[in-house]
Swiss-Prot record:
Molecular-function annotations in GO: DNA-binding transcription factor activity, RNA polymerase II-specific; RNA polymerase II cis-regulatory region sequence-specific DNA binding; zinc ion binding
Keywords: DNA-binding, Metal-binding, Nucleus, Repeat, Transcription, Transcription regulation, Zinc, Zinc-finger
Record lineage: Eukaryota, Metazoa, Chordata, Craniata, Vertebrata
Single GO cellular component term: nucleus
Location(s), subcellular: Nucleus
Name of protein: Putative zinc finger protein 137
Family: Belongs to the krueppel C2H2-type zinc-finger protein family.
Length: 207
């Protein structure tokens, strides 16, 4: 391939990627960090190790690694975490712009997509329709879960006994059989249950 042509095509690809990211991401900081991939700029430096990084989030995650096995503390809200992964996930709360507001009730979301899904609770819109039975859903995840009823697909497998289930929520509920976890407590008598259905059935004795 001609070198000049290759460079032009590579540059064009970068321009396209930048354009897509500018449309998908409403955070200028994300785009700026992405562009540093090409410039090689690393303006954020770890004071402990001297490592230079291209973005604030990368620096934060790197610094959190120093705290593995210790208590990692968030510099913004002083909340503490036990490991690097959880503190890095938490930090996104501070790093993302909560700028999407529902014009019906005022509830605020960090992502436009979350707002769009939430607004369907007001509009009643259900854009996902299953062709075999005609049932409609407001969320893609609910549609996918229902589809498995028809297809028989069970992608979630229990590591303890090998049982396969249609959804992650069903898997979590099933795993309580093995762990003995009982998350549902009766406020009247203090009795605890592993399943909501058992908890709900128990409640009837108090009424």
């Amino acid at each position: 391939m001609n070198v000049a042509r290759f460079l032009v095509e590579k540059h064009t690809l970068h321009v396209i990627i930048d354009f897509i990211l500018s449309k998908v991401s409403n955070q200028q900081s994300n785009l700026a960090q992405h562009q540093r991939v090409y410039t090689g700029e690393k303006p954020y430096k770890c004071n402990e190790w001297g490592k230079a990084l291209s973005g604030k989030s990368s620096l934060f995650y790197h610094q959190a690694i120093h705290g593995v096995g210790k208590l990692c503390k968030c510099n913004d809200c002083h909340k503490v975490f036990s490991n690097a992964t959880t503190i890095a996930n938490h930090w996104r709360i501070h790093n993302e712009d909560r700028s999407y507001k529902c014009n019906k009730c005022g509830k605020i979301f960090r992502h436009r997509s979350y707002l769009a899904v939430y607004q369907r609770t007001h509009t009643g819109e259900k854009p996902y329709k299953y062709h075999d039975c005609g049932k409609v859903f407001s969320q893609a995840s609910s549609y996918a879960k229902h589809r498995r009823i028809h297809t028989g697909e069970k992608p979630h497998k229990c590591d303890d006994c090998g049982k396969v289930l249609t959804s992650r929520s069903h898997l979590i509920r099933h795993q309580r059989i093995h762990t003995g976890q009982k998350s549902y407590k009766c406020l009247k008598c203090g009795k605890v249950f592993s399943l909501w259905a058992l908890h709900a059935e128990h409640q009837k004795i108090h009424f």
